[in-house]
Every structure is written in structure tokens, then in C-alpha cells.
Amino acid sequence: MAARLITEGERVANEGNDALVEALRDELRAAGLGRVILLGRLEHMRGPRLKVGLARWGFQVLVPPAAEQAWLEQAIVAAMEEGVPRRADVEHLAALIAEGSEHGVEGLVLACEELSPLVGACGLELPLVEAWMLQGREA
């Protein structure tokens, strides 16, 4: 099955400041990134906080389609349970990200710490911003 990405086109009114989104905005701007793939647990990819929050600042945020999101959730859980990412999961994720690169993606936003070993095993050259590391800067 070919990995496919979709663009999140939803918009919501600005509901005030979100320190995490602002920290991500600053990191993405500093890295010169405008079009990114958001990867994480289901709640991160499906929820509006990061997608819509970054879109309000002019970033184009892509997320995998629902089937790929469900697969990624399972891959994260398997890597946590087994202590290392499965080779097939690493290859699948690398293909998903490579497809994003073919569609102009400039970098990755990782929304959860548990995803870092899986992405790290892909050996990618795309820049990444780890949202979970910015949590402490929310205050």
C-alpha cells in the first residue's frame, strides 16, 4: 500500500495564546521550514491544537491519512513494548516521509517522545523539530 499524505485545511478562530505552538513557530521559523509533516500519537495528528495552531501562523501542516495514522500508532506502541523499532515499521515510515519530501515537505514535527527512536532509525536527512522537547518552554 502506497503511503499518502493529506493537507489539513481546517481553520479555527484564534482562541488565545498557546505557548507550545508559539515555541514550535519560533523553531520552525528559525529552521526556515514552512511545509512540514506532523507525526505523533493519534491525538496529536487528529487534534487541532498543533495542526491548526501552526496553520494560523502560516505553516502548511501535513498529516498522514487515517489509515497511516492508525498504523503509526501501532508502530509506536510496538516499539515501546519491544524496546526497539521493527525493521518493517522503520521502512514503512521512511517511505511515508520520503513521499512527503516528493510533495515539497521541508521538515518534520514530532509530537511525542515515543516516536523519536522510530524516526531516528529511518536515517533521514530532513530537519525535525521535536515538539515534546519544547513542553518545558510553555511557561
Regions found by a protein language model. Give the residues of each.
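Non-catalytic structural scaffold of enzyme domains
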Residues: M1-A139
